[in-house]
Amino acid sequence: MTKRPLGLGKKNKQKRHKPDEGADGKKESTPLDQIHVEVEGGGDPEDSVVQLKALWRNYLQSEREDERVLNGIVHECDRLLRNREQEGIELGEDFHSIYALALSELAIFRTEEKGQAGRESVGEFFDAAAERVDMGLQHFPASDVLALAKAKIIFQRIPLQYVSQLSPNNSEGADVGLQQLLEEGKSSFRVVAQDPLAVSEPLEIFSDLLEIIANFGREDEIDEGLDSDAEDEPEEVELPESHPLYELRQHLPEHAEWLQQQLLALFKVLEKPNAEEEESEATKFYRKIANKLGQSYLDAAAEPSIVFTTLTYETEDPSAEDEQKAQEAQRVAQGLTERAIEFFKEAESADDPQTWVDTAEVFISLGNLQENESETQEMLYKQAEEKMVRANKATNGKYKHILDTLLDSKT
């Protein structure tokens, strides 16, 4: 498989549109009534809460680069809170969720601010977001929507407020137990079937966080590796037990397993698309989650695959114990890789040859886990070759180098 880019705070590294400045140099927010929103689903366009939901939905579907929209949402939430009794406004779980998540999103913009003031600003916004979601849960303690929002805020907060201040040799910057905080977020997470996007985003943030933890201290070396043909990955940077990320790293396998289980739960509530829905957003989302699941199983297979390969092909005079370990590792790796293939197939698109290549590469990985030159191995390599040939033809030779490598390995 191709090397995966790190999820090192991708959002806060993107270019952001800052609020316009007034004549006095102060940042100006955009009032809600100056932002045009379209109300869907037959909602009352004069209803302030309906307008707020529409604006939030529009923001989520945008590039999320305009801080003014978030400021408009937060200001409107403040107004609704102040005037709820006077105007007879009923504020439900969605209102509290939007309010909290908008504050959390604003914290992302503050990560661009330098120095102590910037760090404090990030913390203040996350404090406000956490307070708001907890207040919502006081009113709606059984709300899955608010529980999910709380999980997302925690998953965002750990890398942006705490991990960003750390280095391998600097343990200052995290005055809370990060492992305990992450477990709190996991406990709060819910799969809300009626809003798959709201479910998937916290999981993406969680996945990015696991990569940050695993690769902490070697980001530059990995970035250089992504831009080169180097095969060897940089060695893991060891952390002292006193480091705030030490415990998180020790629990990485169980965190990865939790992520996989939540992706599975999300995938189960998605409808399998039909041929007529090839280009629909729902179909693209279905394939995206299928791809993530396939990758999660492939990642899980990596360690037993290495054990099998090392003991089988790189160990001279292996002992009986080594052979037993190799067989067990082979069995585990094969099962995980077979599961990965199932999901990569689900992620295939008739219009995207890269998805065929992704599946082909997993067939090769599974072939490498078979007895050398066995019928099963040859069959898997053949299936990979067929997909590679098809993709290569569809792209006028884009994958020729991969196909040539596969064919050379079979001769």
UniProtKB/Swiss-Prot annotation:
Q: Where in the cell?
A: Nucleus
Quick one: where's region Disordered?
1-45
Q: GO CC terms on record? A: nucleus
Output compositional bias ranges, type Basic and acidic residues. Answer: 18-39
Tell me the keywords, alphabetical order: Nucleus, Transcription, Transcription regulation, Translation regulation
| Entry-linked Pfam families | Nro1 (PF12753)
A Gene Ontology biological process in which this protein takes part is: positive regulation of SREBP signaling pathway
Query: What family does the entry list?
Result: Belongs to the ETT1 family.
Q: Function of this protein?
A: Required for correct translation termination and probably involved in regulation of hypoxic gene expression.
Q: What is this protein called?
A: Enhancer of translation termination 1
- The gene name on file is ETT1
